[in-house]
Structure formats: structure tokens, C-alpha cells
Amino acid sequence: MCIRDRDRLARSVGKQLMIDSAEIAGLMNDSAFQQKLGYNKETLPCLFIPETYQVYWDMSAEEFFERMQKEHQKFWNQERLDKATAIGMTPTEVCTLAAIVEEETNNNPEKPMVAGLYINRLHTGMPLQADPTIKFALQDFGLRRITNAHLAVESPYNTYLNTGLPPGPIRIPSPIGLDAVLNHTKHNYLYMCAKEDFSGTHNFASNYAEHMKNARKYWNALNERKIFK
């Protein structure tokens, strides 16, 4: 399940445990509680590591968050912390980038490639220009074609207008997504475009001219299928 906001997470937890979802949501929206955990409202989703856990169904909301904090610390072992440091990122920044990577592709083998591309952009000061951040900024996750009008949306999550990472993750990434960033593929690609066969994978390019050739193939495929939005 893709969880993009705190309210949906609260509802999901409430269905599994004897905790009122409003109580979970209340804590997640409490700035003092966020700060106690080491986050703010934008970065709090980074606390959660999606996995199957055995928990007491009658645990309290506070106990739930304590357990999630322990699982977070368990995931972020020294090896992963060292890998994050090596690429100049904190765990929260890794989470934020992993969320974008997982929105870009459902293809697990491709995720380290996509992560490597975004890390290249970050290291060269280029905007990420990640379409999923536009969908998040607009809260329109059904968009299939991003237009110039969409790219003009004023939002700190618009990675076309703002350089660097957005304020927080646009979804809760999986362990696979997090590890894709930590173990990203090293290459010289700076551009990518969805493949014209709609396979869910991408064509990668190291320069803009090559990228535009790939983009035209995809645009033509969209036009042929009459996908205009």
C-alpha cells in the first residue's frame, strides 16, 4: 500500500490495532511530539520502516510510536549510516530521495539506477525535476502527463522550481527504496524519460540532446494513445 500522508497512515494503523486513528493522527500532527521523536510535520514519515511486525493489538498510541522508533534504529544500523554519510546524506534525506525513486519506478532492479541519477543531479547542483513531486504538490496522483502549467505550481515540493530535496518524503518508502539510494548505481546519467512501450521503466541519457530524443518517443506514444492529461 502506498501511504502519502499522515491521515492515511493513522487510518491504516487504526484498522490493525485497537487504537483510535484520531489519536494516532493527533500525535502525528502534534509539533511537540514530532520534535520529541526528532522530526517535523514534513519529515515524520521517515520514522516508519514498512515491514511486517508482531505487536500487541491492544498497545497504546505512545507504545506504537516507541516500537516504530526502535524498528527505525534497528534498520539504520552502522553499515547503513556509513553508506549515508558516504553520499553526504542523513537518514531523513535518504528517505526523502527514496520516496521519489519509488514514485518514479515500480521496477526494483531499476531503482538503484534512478537513485544514482538523482544523486548525480544533487552533486552537480541541478534541480531534481522529478515529476512525482509535481503530482504531490498538486495532490493529483492520477496525472499521466505533466504539462508546463503543472510545472509552474508554487510549492516547496516543486523540484523543477527549487533545487535540492523537497522538505520531506512524498510517500513512505520501502526498505528496498531506501537501500536503492544507499547502494545506488554509479553512472554518468543526468536525464531519464519513461519508455515509449509503457513498461514502467526508463530510457537514460547523459546529455540533454540524447534525452530529448527519448522524450519525443514518449510524447509521440502518449499522443498515439490520446493521453493528454
Task: Show which residues each predicted segment covers.
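Short, structural beta-strand-to-alpha-helix junction motif
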Residues: D5-R6, S60
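Short, small-residue-biased leader/transition segments that mark boundaries at the very start
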Residues: M1-I3
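Bacterial extracytoplasmic/cell-wall-associated proteins, especially those involved in peptidoglycan
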Residues: M18-A22, G26, F33-K229
